[in-house]
Regions:
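Glycine-rich phosphate-binding loops of nucleotide-dependent enzymes
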Residues: 1-190
Length: 190
C-alpha cells in the first residue's frame, strides 16, 4: 500500500491511524463501535492513549468528556448525553458517532465503505456533506458503495469492480448511470 507516494509496510491498525488513515466501516455495529461503550469512549477508540486523552497510562476523563460533547454538537448526534451507550442510539446517530471520530483527527485517506447503508435521508445528506468537507480539506477519499446516486454525486473518478476485478475506470463527469449498472452487474466489459 502507498500513502502520499510512500510505500507503507504492513502495519497494525494503530500505525495506520497514526499515518492518517480513517475508516468508516460497512457494518457500524460490528466493526465501527463498541455497542456497550459510551459515546465518549467510542469517540476516542483510536486516540485514547494520546494527549489530551491520556497522560502516560492515566486516562484524562475531563478531556474525553469534553471531546465527546464537542463532537456531539459539531456532528449533530441526537442523544441525551455523552455517557449514553452507543447501542442505545439510532442507526443514523451511530453512524454520526463513527464519522465524528474518524474525521476529528488529521485525515490523509478516508476509506468509506457503504457509509450510508440503512440510514434515513437526513442522515445520508449529513454523511455526504462530511465526506465532501474532508475531500475539500485535502483528504483522499476512497468511497465503496453499491448506491449509484451516491457514487455519482460524491466521486471524481469511478472504478467498477466485478468478481474482485476492476472492469472499468472512468471520470465521474463521463459516467453514465445505466452503463455503470451494467458494469456492476457484469453484463458489460469496458
Amino acid at each position: 500500500m502507498k500513502l502520499d507516494g510512500k510505500v507503507m509496510p504492513f502495519m497494525n491498525p494503530r500505525h495506520l491511524v497514526e499515518h492518517g488513515l480513517s475508516h468508516i466501516p460497512e457494518d457500524r455495529q460490528k466493526h465501527g463501535l463498541v455497542m456497550s461503550y459510551s459515546i465518549a469512549d467510542n469517540e476516542v477508540l483510536c486516540t485514547y492513549y494520546q494527549p489530551p486523552f491520556a497522560r502516560g497510562i492515566q486516562r484524562m476523563f475531563p478531556a474525553i468528556v469534553e471531546n465527546a460533547r464537542s463532537l456531539i454538537k459539531r456532528f449533530d448526534v441526537r442523544t441525551p448525553g455523552e455517557q449514553v451507550p452507543a447501542g442505545n442510539l439510532s442507526g443514523g446517530n451511530q453512524q454520526k458517532v463513527i464519522v465524528a471520530r474518524e474525521l476529528s483527527r488529521p485525515v490523509r485517506l478516508l476509506v468509506a465503505n457503504q457509509p450510508t447503508r440503512g440510514l434515513d435521508v437526513g442522515s445520508i445528506e449529513y454523511i455526504h456533506q462530511q465526506i465532501v468537507v474532508a475531500r475539500d480539506a485535502g483528504s483522499a477519499v476512497l468511497l465503496i458503495s453499491a448506491e449509484l446516486d451516491e457514487i455519482l454525486s460524491l466521486s471524481d473518478r469511478i472504478a467498477v469492480m466485478y468478481h474482485g476485478q476492476i472492469v472499468a475506470i472512468m471520470e465521474a463527469s463521463q459516467a453514465d448511470r445505466s452503463e455503470l449498472g451494467l458494469l456492476m452487474a457484469g453484463s458489460k466489459k469496458a
